[in-house]
């Protein structure tokens, strides 16, 4: 089984949290709402990976004013690829508390939508199990 280290930002701006809706046909949680983030590449430092993933998935215009390591956890997930193949992967999640100075988002093709969500509205979204667990640990669900 392949292992991936995943950097995952919990991004907050003016009391709202950023959620991204995965595309329907691929990824670990197709069609569900999630936090952004992705894999650390070989030789890449953790914060470099976090900033790269944010740039790739959310665009160059989003400015983070604060990044603080928060927690980590692991689990096993099945990833679905665009061609329909599936792979079981051991995931190690490194989760960061982040504050953004703005809300300038330009999502890439991994997502079909995004939303800045008030804490009391988070439970209204079809959150994937990993995001639900993370938000519950934070006391937001």
From Swiss-Prot:
Report the EC code(s) recorded for this entry: 3.6.1.9, 3.6.1.12, 3.6.1.-, 3.6.1.23
Gene3D superfamilies per record: Nucleoside Triphosphate Pyrophosphohydrolase
UniProt-listed InterPro entries = Nucleoside_triphosphatase_NudI (IPR023781), Nudix_hydrolase (IPR020476), NUDIX_hydrolase-like_dom_sf (IPR015797), NUDIX_hydrolase_CS (IPR020084), NUDIX_hydrolase_dom (IPR000086)
State the similarity comment. Answer: Belongs to the Nudix hydrolase family. NudI subfamily.
Give the function comment from the record.
Catalyzes the hydrolysis of nucleoside triphosphates, with a preference for pyrimidine deoxynucleoside triphosphates (dUTP, dTTP and dCTP).
Q: Which reaction does it catalyse?
A: a ribonucleoside 5'-triphosphate + H2O = a ribonucleoside 5'-phosphate + diphosphate + H(+); a 2'-deoxyribonucleoside 5'-triphosphate + H2O = a 2'-deoxyribonucleoside 5'-phosphate + diphosphate + H(+); dUTP + H2O = dUMP + diphosphate + H(+); dTTP + H2O = dTMP + diphosphate + H(+)
Organism, as annotated: Salmonella heidelberg (strain SL476)
- Please identify the protein, giving its name as recorded: Nucleoside triphosphatase NudI
Enzyme's top EC category: hydrolase
The molecular function terms of the Gene Ontology recorded here are: dCTP diphosphatase activity; dTTP diphosphatase activity; dUTP diphosphatase activity; magnesium ion binding
Q: Does the keyword Metal-binding apply?
A: no
Q: Where is this motif: Nudix box?
A: 38-59
Its quaternary structure? Answer: Monomer.
User: What keywords sit in the KW lines?
Assistant: Hydrolase, Magnesium
- Looking at the record, the residues that make up the Nudix hydrolase domain are 1-141
Which cofactors are named for this entry?
A: Mg(2+)
Signal sequence extent: none
TM annotation in the entry: none
Question: What superkingdom does the record give?
Answer: Bacteria
Write down a Pfam family by its short name. NUDIX
């Amino acid at each position: 089984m392949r292992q991936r280290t995943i950097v995952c930002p919990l991004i907050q701006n003016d009391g709202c949290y950023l959620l991204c809706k995965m595309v329907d046909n691929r990824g670990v949680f197709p069609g569900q709402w999630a936090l952004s983030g992705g894999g650390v590449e070989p030789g890449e430092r953790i914060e470099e990976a976090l900033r790269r993933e944010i740039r790739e998935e959310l665009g160059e215009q989003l400015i983070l004013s604060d990044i603080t390591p928060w927690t980590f956890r692991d689990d096993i997930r099945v990833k679905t690829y665009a061609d329909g193949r599936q792979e079981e992967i051991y995931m190690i999640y490194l989760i960061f508390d982040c504050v953004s100075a703005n809300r300038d988002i330009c999502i890439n093709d991994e997502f079909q939508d995004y939303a800045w969500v008030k804490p009391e509205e988070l439970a209204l979204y079809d959150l994937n199990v990993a995001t639900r667990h993370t938000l519950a640990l934070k006391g937001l669900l």
